[in-house]
């Protein structure tokens, strides 16, 4: 009999997709036929003449399942959507597509929407979907502060008996013992079991060079030879001597500055921890900079945005990046398998 697990979260960008990818790949490795589904998608992009849910496409591709897994996508402002759709029609679309996706599967992992409350107005919030699909629920809590415990308890009120298991994600090291002690006691009293606490990993919160190029709407002057991750951004509005100090202290840095700052760019290219250069204002550098960047394998991105706008765009996507590309998938799998009790999840689902 097919089993269903809905992975929900108390807030957006909690790491649901990464956990689903790691769990799905582990279950498949153990011999289970794994399906993937998402009822409501809000991060939509245009493919041809239709809107599709980008996050679910990426996750489905990594899991090696069919990619058309999200029957309801937000293709207009939410208030317009909520006042123009028929919840009965939406629920039927969800059930029909889930029936197709689940055929021949031992287990289907369902990804919740932005957070467990999203979709209440149209009747396909996570709790409603879990009830429709007779799913068990695994809740992900991003440990930004101690108040996440209150958020988890509020979610328990919404899900009721469907929710029994919790994973905390992106936990700072000093909070791990707190979770094992106080938080576990409080949640156990509410009928919740913490099955994992995944530590924060700066690489997972970082950006690939391609994600940086997309964020600043740039073009490559020097393309990356391999996938590199950027964890910090350094703004080059200073002398080369001052910048040197910041670049030395930065981890896997991207330098953002104008293409006319040849002295600064050449200094940055001497630093082994500089992962890419982002040149603003459509100012191309002198050939010496490009030649040296090519020699050292440092990608160079040119954008029409000014430095402030480029940095603002990067700040808006740091920590909200997707788990894609072999390096991130590998790290997420290792963290998941080291810090989450997979056996307990399997028993929770009733898988043989």
UniProtKB/Swiss-Prot annotation:
InterPro entries: DRTGG, P-loop_NTPase, Phos_Acetyltrans/Butyryltrans, Ser_kin/Pase_Hpr-like_N_sf. Pfam families: AAA_26, DRTGG. Coiled coil: none annotated. SUPFAM superfamilies: HprK N-terminal domain-like, P-loop containing nucleoside triphosphate hydrolases. To Synechocystis PCC 6803 slr0039. This is Uncharacterized protein AF_1212. It comes from Archaeoglobus fulgidus (strain ATCC 49558 / DSM 4304 / JCM 9628 / NBRC 100126 / VC-16).
């Amino acid at each position: 009999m097919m089993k269903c697990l809905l992975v929900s979260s108390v807030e957006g960008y909690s790491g649901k997709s990464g956990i689903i990818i790691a769990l799905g790949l582990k279950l498949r490795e153990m011999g289970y036929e794994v399906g993937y589904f998402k009822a409501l998608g809000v991060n939509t992009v245009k493919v041809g003449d239709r809107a599709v849910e980008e996050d679910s496409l990426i996750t489905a591709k990594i899991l090696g399942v069919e990619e058309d897994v999200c029957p309801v996508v937000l293709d207009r402002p939410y208030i317009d959507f909520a006042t123009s759709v028929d919840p009965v029609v939406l629920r039927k679309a969800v059930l029909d597509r889930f029936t197709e996706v689940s055929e021949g599967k031992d287990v289907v992992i369902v990804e919740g929407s932005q957070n467990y409350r999203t979709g209440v107005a149209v009747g396909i919030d996570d709790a409603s979907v879990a009830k429709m699909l007779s799913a068990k629920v695994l809740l992900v809590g991003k440990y930004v502060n101690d108040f996440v415990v209150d958020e988890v308890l509020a979610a328990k009120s919404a899900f009721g008996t469907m929710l029994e298991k919790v994973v905390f994600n992106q936990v700072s090291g000093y909070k791990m013992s707190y979770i094992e002690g106080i938080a576990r006691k409080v949640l156990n009293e509410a009928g919740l079991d913490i099955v994992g606490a995944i530590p924060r990993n700066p690489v997972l919160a970082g950006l690939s060079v391609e994600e940086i190029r997309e964020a600043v709407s740039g073009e490559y002057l020097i393309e990356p030879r391999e996938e590199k991750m950027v964890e910090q951004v350094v703004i080059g509005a200073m002398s080369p001597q001052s910048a040197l100090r910041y670049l030395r202290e930065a981890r896997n840095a991207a330098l953002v500055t104008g293409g006319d700052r040849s002295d600064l760019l050449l200094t940055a290219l001497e630093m082994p921890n500089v992962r890419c250069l982002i040149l603003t204002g459509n100012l191309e550098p002198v050939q010496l900079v490009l030649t040296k960047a090519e020699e050292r394998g440092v990608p160079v991105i040119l954008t029409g945005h000014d430095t402030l706008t480029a940095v603002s765009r990067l700040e808006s996507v740091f920590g909200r990046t997707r788990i894609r590309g072999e390096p991130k998938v590998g790290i997420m799998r290792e963290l998941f398998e080291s810090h989450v009790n997979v056996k307990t999840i399997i028993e929770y689902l009733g898988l043989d």
